[in-house]
């Protein structure tokens, strides 16, 4: 577990959730398949129960990193709705003509936080005067910085702080934000960079 008392906001980083209808969903559909970013697991599971009860429609869900899901959809995966933690992957599918512009909505926001394993603390000043090598003595876990939204945002934040070249060798990059959260919960990384909504679990 991670403790909410060990959460610090990471400067200059946020995300936008983008929702798109991948294919036209029939008005009388018996089921709807939702592909959603792993960071939304709890929220979507709660909404799924409400939607199924109110509409008598089965909701099938698949969770992974936004990049993984986008590639699966491109390869023909049967998604009706795609909820991405990164607008770039929604753009990717839109450019492939798999999501129509008028079927897309950008909404919601999130922020990045630093987390530590339960029972451990971290005192850090998040500005350009701080030497991250003095603060981060162990591994730093986040999503893949090339493809997973949380990792891309983490890289952007560290770059803005002027820390990236010193942070990069310490990184453990994961397939999605939940995997990063679990690394920290098990004490395998000194800190993690995740979304505030994940840290609150």
Regions found by a protein language model. Name each.
Residues 1-6:
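N-terminal secretory signal peptides that target proteins for export/translocation
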Residues 8-11, 26:
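Residue-level detector of intrinsically disordered/flexible regions characterized by low predicted structural confidence
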Residues 11-22:
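Bacterial N-terminal signal peptides
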Residues 25-77, 84-87, 91-201:
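Exported/periplasmic ABC-transporter solute-binding proteins
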